[in-house]
Amino acid sequence: MTTPLPTERTAVAHSVPTLGLAVDISDEGAVDAAVAAVESALPPIVGLANVAGVSSPVDFLDVTTAEWDRVFDVNMRGTFFVTRRVAPAMIAAGVGRIVSVSSISAQRGGGTYSKVPYSASKAAVIGFTRALAREMGPHHITVNCVAPGPIDTEIMGGTLTEERKAAMSADIPLGRVGTVDDVAALLTFLMSDDAGYITAATYDVNGGLQIS
């Protein structure tokens, strides 16, 4: 028997229909098929969170074209593919929320586990967000961005041992590495009706690391 994921249990508890799909968002055809499946199984899409991401620990002079493309294909190209695919439905509905995940690395220039490819791709997400907000505004669609600091996720490459967390936390005013719940709370707000007059914004979620 398969154990339900936490998201599945939450959906059942609130009687929310769900559909889980594993998709390579760097593949335009796969994105189109996945969104089509969601559209046929669930109510119209009026909220999109672009959260997929990959990093790179490679120093700039050692970055190959393949490595550069690998990072941009997911972090920026994938964000473009998914957003472009779902935007028409939001326009038709006359309402929408688009939130993309950038990174503090886009603002500070790398650090932690990320280097130039990751920082550049996440900076592109911020520019994408601001430009798209201009075009989507007349359709009552908000477009925002969150820029997390160090978060305990798989993108850190399994390097966040308790010892490393403690070392990283020393530079964070709030004294700890972030959790996925810290980011999810902001994403949830930006998807809500309460955020209807917020667009083209980038929010730091880093425990104050931007001032250290």
Regions found by a protein language model. Give the residues of each.
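Residue(s) in the substrate-gating loop at a strand-loop-helix junction
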Residues: 103
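Short C-terminal tail/terminal secondary-structure segment
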Residues: 188, 199-212
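The beta1-alpha1 cofactor-binding region of Rossmann-like NAD(H)/NADP(H)-dependent oxidoreductases
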Residues: 22-33, 65, 181-182
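Alpha-helical segment proximal to the catalytic Tyr-Lys
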Residues: 88, 130, 134-135, 196
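Short, small/polar-rich loop/turn modules that mediate ligand/substrate recognition or access, typified
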Residues: 137, 142, 198-200
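Substrate-binding pocket helix/loop in short-chain dehydrogenase/reductase
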Residues: 59-60, 67-72, 164-168
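Active-site helix of classical SDR
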Residues: 83, 121, 129
